[in-house]
A protein has these predicted regions:
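Short, surface-exposed charged micro-motifs
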Residues: 41-43, 140, 150
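Short hydrophobic-aromatic micro-motifs
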Residues: 51-54, 117
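Nuclease catalytic cores
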Residues: 48, 56, 60-64
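C-terminal interaction segment
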Residues: 2-18, 68-74, 78-135, 142-199
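A structure-centric signal for secondary-structure junctions around beta-strands
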Residues: 40-41, 48, 99, 113
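Short Gly/Ser/Thr- and Asp/Glu-enriched loop/turn motifs at secondary-structure junctions
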Residues: 46-48, 85
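Polyampholytic, low-complexity intrinsically disordered segments
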Residues: 1-45
C-alpha cells in the first residue's frame, strides 16, 4: 500500500464536511499505484506533484447526486443523447489525474467528457479548473457555498458563463435553486418541479 499509514481518512458519512488529505512530493507512478490500491470511497487527483484524496461528507453526496437526476430529466425532455461518466478517472500522463463528482458526454461518447461537475465543501476551486484545462474538458460546473458557477473553456482558459453550452436551456442562477433543495428534500419532488420549470 502506498500511503496506508495515513489512511483511512474519516469516511463517516455523518460528517458534514469533506475530509481531505494532501500528499506532497509525489510522482505519476505514486498516483497510479494509489489508484490500483484498494481505497474505496475516495476521490483522487494528481497535479504539480501533489496527490489529493477526498472522502465526501453526506452533504457532499446529497448535492452531487441531485445533478444526475436533473441532467437526466433535461435530456429526456429535450431528447438529447447523453452518456453518464460518473467519477471516471480522467488522465493526461504525467501531468494531471482527476476524478470529478459527476461527468457527461453528449451526442456521442468520448474519452474526455463534455461536462464535469465539482461539488466543493472544503477544497478545490481555481486549481481544479487548471486541472480540467490541461485535460481539455469543454465545460465545468462548480457548486460551492450554495452557489453554482458555469465555466466554458476557450483559447484564454475558462471563462464564466451564465447559460450552459452543453445544456443550453440551463441558467446557473436558476438551476442552483433546484440543486440546493437536494440538501433537505426528496429528489422525486425536486425532479417534478424541475420538469415543470423547463417545459
Amino acid at each position: 500500500m502506498l500511503i496506508n499509514a495515513q489512511l483511512p481518512i474519516s469516511s463517516d458519512r455523518l460528517n458534514r464536511q469533506d475530509q481531505t488529505l494532501r500528499l506532497a512530493d509525489m510522482n505519476w507512478d505514486d498516483y497510479e499505484q494509489l489508484l490500483s490500491d484498494d481505497y474505496p470511497g475516495y476521490l483522487a487527483s494528481f497535479f504539480n506533484g501533489v496527490i489529493t484524496l477526498m472522502s465526501p461528507s453526506i452533504n457532499h453526496e446529497k448535492i452531487s447526486q441531485i445533478f444526475p437526476i436533473l441532467i437526466a430529466a433535461y435530456c429526456r425532455q429535450f431528447k438529447l443523447t447523453y452518456f453518464p461518466r460518473g467519477s471516471t478517472t480522467l488522465k493526461k500522463k504525467p501531468l494531471v489525474g482527476k476524478e470529478p463528482d459527476v461527468s457527461y458526454a453528449f451526442g456521442t461518447d468520448k474519452d474526455i467528457p463534455d461536462l464535469a461537475i465539482e461539488v466543493i465543501f472544503s477544497s478545490g476551486g481555481i486549481e481544479d479548473l487548471e486541472k480540467y484545462r490541461i485535460l481539455g474538458v469543454p465545460e465545468v460546473w462548480f457548486w460551492q457555498n450554495k452557489e453554482l458557477t458555469f465555466y466554458r473553456l476557450g483559447d484564454a482558459g475558462y471563462q464564466e458563463i451564465a447559460v450552459s453550452v452543453c445544456l443550453p436551456k440551463l441558467v446557473a442562477k436558476n438551476l442552483v435553486g433546484f440543486v440546493n433543495r437536494g440538501m433537505t428534500e426528496s429528489p422525486l419532488t425536486i425532479e417534478a418541479d424541475f420538469n415543470s420549470d423547463i417545459k
